[in-house]
Design a protein with these regions (language model features):
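Bacterial N-terminal signal peptides
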Residues: 4-15
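Short S/T/G/P-rich N-terminal loop/turn motif that feeds into the first structured element of a domain
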Residues: 19-253
Length: 253
């Protein structure tokens, strides 16, 4: 009996160790660039020909690069990953002082700067996110969704996604790509969920969401979670959606 107990304890500890080893503890960064008027193509070309390679040279992992399907603001949205915030700071410092980058930047900006504005947010994957890794699966579109929760309800929202929403998305033909919360110390860190889905097309996305919203399992899960929280888990207009296409050099396509 004692031997059996010890063996069982060893198995449990081994499983826990493996689970911890598999946990993605990387720091993610979501970067949004607003290209200067008429410069989005040149910006994408600079990333394709120079920037992504130099990021990798300096220890940064390219996760994915996207542009919105409707893009009047000329946005480029991309994600990087690093072992830590300290590693991120060192990598960017080395990148910015790399003569190859300085030459590429100088030559690409002969006729003016390519970027008007940059926004950065640091993220950590949720414990229910699929593994974030390169994937090229043919023609498809992506959807970046950002949720802002009512006060104190980010945990409840994560619980609902973990226990119900992801499975129902897959049931209705949507692909879960990645899920993140903001890292502490940033505005919105206690109330923001950011995630990416993939769809066969915009039309298929609309069909999938219509079927999802009318699914009795979703209706029940939503009702139960909102009754427990005493109301909606998200603020009014707290769900933002951007449909995107991957750039031709994006590791996730």
């Amino acid at each position: 009996m004692l031997l059996r107990t010890l063996l069982w304890g060893s198995i449990v500890m081994t499983a826990a160790t493996l689970q911890a080893a598999d946990a993605d503890t990387r720091v993610y960064e979501m970067r949004t660039y607003w290209a200067a008027e008429g410069k989005l193509d040149a910006l994408n070309a600079r990333f394709r020909d120079h920037t992504t390679k130099l990021f990798e040279k300096h220890g940064m992992t390219n996760i994915g690069y996207w542009v919105p399907l409707e893009n009047p603001d000329r946005k480029l949205i991309y994600f990087l990953a690093y072992p830590s915030r300290e590693a991120r700071e060192k990598s960017f410092k080395d990148f910015l002082t790399d003569p190859q980058w300085q030459k590429a930047q100088r030559e690409s900006e002969v006729n003016g700067k390519l970027v008007d504005k940059v926004e950065s947010r640091f993220l950590q994957v949720t414990d229910y996110s699929p593994a974030v890794k390169p994937a090229k699966k043919g023609e498809r579109i992506f959807e970046l969704r950002t949720y802002t929760t009512t006060p104190g309800n980010l945990g409840a929202l994560n619980d609902r996604f973990r226990n119900h929403t992801l499975k129902l998305f897959e049931k209705h033909g949507m692909t879960n790509v990645a899920y993140w919360n903001l890292m502490p110390g940033q505005e919105g860190a206690d109330n923001t969920l950011v995630y990416i889905l993939a769809h066969a097309s915009k039309e298929e996305a609309d069909k999938s969401f219509a079927a999802f919203r009318s699914d009795p399992d979703w209706v029940a899960a939503r009702k139960a979670s909102e009754e427990k929280a005493g109301g909606s888990l998200t603020v009014p207009e707290g769900v933002k959606s951007v449909f995107m296409r991957a750039t031709d050099d994006s590791p996730i396509q």
